[in-house]
Amino acid sequence: MAVYTLDLLAQLPEAYQAFGPLIDILPIIPLFFLLLAFVWQASVGFR
């Protein structure tokens, strides 16, 4: 029963199925900000 409930919660509602690939990518966005901070500091010479 618990496994079925967890599986049900892991599925997106039908109205949002089209956004599935986008939701897979969204958690990566904060990593881009981290990389941006290093690129920015490299460009200003790590003041």
Swiss-Prot record:
InterPro entries: PSII_PsbK, PSII_PsbK_sf. Keywords: Membrane, Photosynthesis, Photosystem II, Reaction center, Thylakoid, Transmembrane, Transmembrane helix. Residues 1-10 form a propeptide. GO terms for biological process: photosynthesis. One of the components of the core complex of photosystem II (PSII). PSII is a light-driven water:plastoquinone oxidoreductase that uses light energy to abstract electrons from H(2)O, generating O(2) and a proton gradient subsequently used for ATP formation. It consists of a core antenna complex that captures photons, and an electron transfer chain that converts photonic excitation into a charge separation. PSII is composed of 1 copy each of membrane proteins PsbA, PsbB, PsbC, PsbD, PsbE, PsbF, PsbH, PsbI, PsbJ, PsbK, PsbL, PsbM, PsbT, PsbX, PsbY, PsbZ, Psb30/Ycf12, peripheral proteins PsbO, CyanoQ (PsbQ), PsbU, PsbV and a large number of cofactors. It forms dimeric complexes. It is found in: Cellular thylakoid membrane. SUPFAM superfamilies: Photosystem II reaction center protein K, PsbK. It holds the Pfam family PsbK. GO terms for cellular component: photosystem II reaction center; plasma membrane-derived thylakoid membrane. This is Photosystem II reaction center protein K. It is a single-pass membrane protein. The gene is psbK. Belongs to the PsbK family. It comes from Synechococcus sp. (strain CC9311). The lineage of its organism: Bacteria, Bacillati, Cyanobacteriota, Cyanophyceae, Synechococcales. The chain crosses the membrane at residues 19-39.
